[in-house]
Amino acid sequence: MGSSKSKPKDPSQRRRSLEPPDSTHHGGFPASQTPNKTAAPDTHRTPSRSFGTVATEPKLFGGFNTSDTVTSPQRAGALAGGVTTFVALYDYESRTETDLSFKKGERLQIVNNTEGDWWLAHSLTTGQTGYIPSNYVAPSDSIQAEEWYFGKITRRESERLLLNPENPRGTFLVRESETTKGAYCLSVSDFDNAKGLNVKHYKIRKLDSGGFYITSRTQFSSLQQLVAYYSKHADGLCHRLTNVCPTSKPQTQGLAKDAWEIPRESLRLEVKLGQGCFGEVWMGTWNGTTRVAIKTLKPGTMSPEAFLQEAQVMKKLRHEKLVQLYAVVSEEPIYIVTEYMSKGSLLDFLKGEMGKYLRLPQLVDMAAQIASGMAYVERMNYVHRDLRAANILVGENLVCKVADFGLARLIEDNEYTARQGAKFPIKWTAPEAALYGRFTIKSDVWSFGILLTELTTKGRVPYPGMVNREVLDQVERGYRMPCPPECPESLHDLMCQCWRKDPEERPTFEYLQAFLEDYLGILAWTPWEDKQEGPRGETASNKQERPGEDTLAADES
């Protein structure tokens, strides 16, 4: 595994210097033509929430319901009403004969959006017609179509994106406020000797007349004009806006239209990534076009009928911190096709070369991401049953996603179902689940506490020196693992809350996510790849003074 610097080497990542039009405005202005959203100060932080896909009734074009949610986690936002012409946010290469290839910026007429996540569209550029992923487009001339608009991402996620050391000062994005519906926030990367890389968040307020402003002395009729102005003038910001924050293409919802139960021949197994008691994991390609991960299960591991029934539920779980289930081969040997995560399992990542460079802020951030995914599982009334570092996958920029949720329930191996054999993860399992088979979201919380020890010890096996039977006996008598070396007591206290004997006294994942994100906020953020210099070689000796720095109040809460 190489460095986690995220250089945009391919067209799937978007970075560009901003060259705005001359649209400076001062004083009052008429209302913007962008969707009317009531902006309010982003005054304080609240625990972040998941943004899974909202199910809606199918509808023919003629109009959009403004309560719809764009499924891309980094381009979320309400679709504009009455719009049938959309613009492409990313390049897309067709994967099947019925798909439509298109380029970023291409305008598309939507013909039919009643068939789920893949819409029938007609390109106004090429004249061709085919199916497109709905989260790759946005209504033409809307704020959702702006490259700098990231919609409904959390404050923490915006910081994760902006704190990439490759980003120069002034890299920015505009997002929805977490605290006030319809409000916006401008998030800007900065650098100084005291804090190193950091992010400033500025409230974007709304005028009664419909305009927008950060400071009342400089007002704009639209967010586009506000961004254009501050790309030329810092005017009280920490730095003028320079580059739009780079981001990768989102995952499509499924491989293609109607690609769920797929033929085994459509998959090519290329690189073996790992092997476990019940099968193997491969990097591979679907249909000769799409990189995927493929989990192959040994015959007899689980009933194909039970698996297919469970998979129908699993594919409906959609969250940016869950590994997306793409497709299945439902006849034995069962194949499970998911999105590919480039850095492999969290356990291998922690124990590998990159693990030694991880500091407490990165570890807490990874834990918060996992808690975010599990908070969604909690809200959906689902249970993972096998939460541990081996079942968390890592991507670029230390993105973590929960994998293999729900599969443990289906395993039919006698040694596993007895819950005592070597194949069963006793050390991660809550006592009521290990002894009596009572698996609930609260037993997942117990497992999360064990996972926290894996993070803080860089992948050490829990309960070192103890065998499974001894662990079960000792835990039943009240033993809990002591605080790992170099782990703050406050984090160990959180682990102990997860290990309370009464499941109902354990915290929720919603609480765990909020605690970890708030805890991360009080840590001095150490950027991935610890550097002594600022972005793009800016050091204390060559850093120039920034006139008017921080004359506008950034929301640091």
From Swiss-Prot:
Residues binding ATP: L273, G274, Q275, G276, C277, F278, G279, E280, V281, K295
What's the protein called, per UniProt? Tyrosine-protein kinase transforming protein Src
Post-translational modification as stated in the protein's UniProt record: The phosphorylated form is termed pp60v-src.
* Keyword annotations of the record: ATP-binding, Kinase, Lipoprotein, Myristate, Nucleotide-binding, Oncogene, Phosphoprotein, SH2 domain, SH3 domain, Transferase, Tyrosine-protein kinase
SH3 domain span: 81-142
* Domain SH2: from-to ranges: 148-245
**Task performed by this protein:** This phosphoprotein, required for both the initiation and the maintenance of neoplastic transformation, is a protein kinase that catalyzes the phosphorylation of tyrosine residues in vitro.
Which residues in this protein are found as Phosphotyrosine?
A: Y416
Q: Where is the Protein kinase domain?
A: 267-520
Lipid-anchored residues (N-myristoyl glycine)? G2
Name the catalysed reactions.
L-tyrosyl-[protein] + ATP = O-phospho-L-tyrosyl-[protein] + ADP + H(+)
Q: Where is this region: Disordered?
A: 1-58, 530-557
Domain of life, source organism: Viruses
- List its EC numbers: 2.7.10.2
- The record's active-site residues are D386
Q: What organism is the protein native to? A: Avian sarcoma virus (strain S2)
**Ranges of biased composition (kind: Basic and acidic residues):** 7-25
Q: Which GO terms describe its molecular function?
A: ATP binding; non-membrane spanning protein tyrosine kinase activity
Query: SUPFAM superfamilies, from UniProt?
Result: Protein kinase-like (PK-like), SH2 domain, SH3-domain
The family line of this record is: Belongs to the protein kinase superfamily. Tyr protein kinase family. SRC subfamily.
